[in-house]
């Protein structure tokens, strides 16, 4: 039986596509049963709808506080039987309501070799610092920004001539292979327990 996962995303959805492609090819034994977004204009919403994935979009400012916002998300996740939450370009910190309900079952992908360049625009930060190596990190989510325990990392090289767009393409190529592989590894370990 496939593990039920929810993908949380705020942007274009390239990692969502990679996860869905891995599910469809059989590389990832999971069912993406829910897409959660906080951005009504996010490209990922259309991608999820085309693939007939149930989608909810909530604007956090529509709620009295973060707890109320996350309580609504938690209710949706529980309603769908979600076992894991996969952050894929979700631009909000996860708070105690979801962290407690999904302890060690929320993971994130970040476009740097953490702890270097946490937060927004990690690729831009790496290019500005003229580093020769950056990469991708998959980590468990805790209450900090990109501070949870690291699960996997993969490096890429940056040449002197690489612009931000070229580095982003290299990063995404790694993300789209690494994330489904790590998700499957975690699901397999969970099933073995």
Q: What annotation goes with each model-predicted range?
A:
Residues 30-72:
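Short, surface-exposed acidic-centric catalytic microdomains
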Residues 56, 64-109, 114:
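Helix-adjacent hinge/juxtasegments
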